[in-house]
């Protein structure tokens, strides 16, 4: 399972959705990254493959950063919220 995490302006907690395949996760990451580069406000609607009913709608102008990482089973797959420099 791969997690795509979004950091928002003025929000200490990130938004996150999950993808089962790396290719799908990379495609979503690239879509969000293009919105960040473009600079024009756009409404992004994201869904989660882990929790089928989870949907997020966010205005691209409110995004600061996006990251992708693999959710591992080691340690229960728990990662502290937010971006980190840990490898």
UniProtKB/Swiss-Prot annotation:
It comes from the Bacteria. HAMAP family: UPF0367. Belongs to the UPF0367 family. This is UPF0367 protein P9211_01391. It comes from Prochlorococcus marinus (strain MIT 9211).
């Amino acid at each position: 399972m791969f997690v795509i995490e979004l950091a928002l302006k003025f929000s200490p907690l990130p938004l996150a959705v999950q993808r089962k395949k790396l290719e799908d996760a990379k495609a979503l990451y690239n879509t969000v990254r293009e919105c960040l580069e473009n600079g024009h406000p756009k409404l992004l609607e994201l869904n989660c493959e882990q929790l089928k009913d989870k949907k997020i709608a966010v205005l691209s102008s409110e995004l600061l950063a996006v990251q992708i990482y693999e959710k591992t089973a080691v340690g229960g797959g728990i990662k502290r919220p937010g971006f980190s420099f840990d490898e």
